[in-house]
C-alpha cells in the first residue's frame, strides 16, 4: 500500500515539475528496449537539440510503447513512440 501511495505522489510531483518546464523535450534516462511500455522512471526532460516530444506530454506517454530501442540520453521523437501524435487532443 505504501508503494502505491509513493508512486502516486511521485507521479503528481513529476507531472507538476514537467508541466512547468517550457521548451524542454523528453529524454530517456536509461536504455529503453524495443516494444517497452514507457514509465515515468524512464523519462526526464531537458532543454536539448534536437527538440523532441514536449515535456508537457509525459503524462500521455506513460504506458505507450517505443517502436525502436532508445539509448540513454536520447531525445524521444514522435516517430519513436507507437500511437503518439503531436496533433492528438491533450487531456
UniProtKB/Swiss-Prot annotation:
<dbReference type="InterPro" id="IPR006013">
    <property type="entry name" value="Antifreeze_III"/>
</dbReference>
<feature type="signal peptide">
    <location>
        <begin position="1"/>
        <end position="22"/>
    </location>
</feature>
<dbReference type="GO" id="GO:0005576">
    <property type="term" value="C:extracellular region"/>
</dbReference>
<protein>
    <recommendedName>
        <fullName>Ice-structuring protein lambda OP-3</fullName>
    </recommendedName>
</protein>
<keyword id="KW-0964">Secreted</keyword>
<feature type="site" description="Important for ice-binding">
    <location>
        <position position="30"/>
    </location>
</feature>
<comment type="function">
    <text>Contributes to protect fish blood from freezing at subzero sea water temperatures. Lowers the blood freezing point. Binds to nascent ice crystals and prevents further growth.</text>
</comment>
<dbReference type="InterPro" id="IPR006190">
    <property type="entry name" value="AFP_Neu5c_C"/>
</dbReference>
<feature type="site" description="Important for ice-binding">
    <location>
        <position position="39"/>
    </location>
</feature>
<dbReference type="InterPro" id="IPR036732">
    <property type="entry name" value="AFP_Neu5c_C_sf"/>
</dbReference>
<feature type="site" description="Important for ice-binding">
    <location>
        <position position="35"/>
    </location>
</feature>
<feature type="site" description="Important for ice-binding">
    <location>
        <position position="65"/>
    </location>
</feature>
<keyword id="KW-0732">Signal</keyword>
<feature type="domain" description="AFP-like">
    <location>
        <begin position="25"/>
        <end position="84"/>
    </location>
</feature>
<keyword id="KW-0047">Antifreeze protein</keyword>
<comment type="similarity">
    <text>Belongs to the type-III AFP family.</text>
</comment>
Amino acid at each position: 500500500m505504501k508503494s502505491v501511495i509513493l508512486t502516486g505522489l511521485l507521479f503528481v510531483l513529476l507531472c507538476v515539475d514537467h508541466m512547468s518546464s517550457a521548451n524542454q523535450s523528453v529524454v530517456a534516462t536509461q536504455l529503453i528496449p524495443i516494444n517497452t511500455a514507457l514509465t515515468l522512471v524512464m523519462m526526464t526532460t531537458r532543454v536539448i537539440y534536437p527538440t523532441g516530444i514536449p515535456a508537457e506530454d509525459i503524462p500521455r506517454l506513460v504506458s505507450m510503447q517505443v517502436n525502436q530501442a532508445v539509448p540513454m540520453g536520447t531525445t524521444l521523437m514522435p516517430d519513436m513512440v507507437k500511437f503518439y501524435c503531436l496533433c492528438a487532443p491533450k487531456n
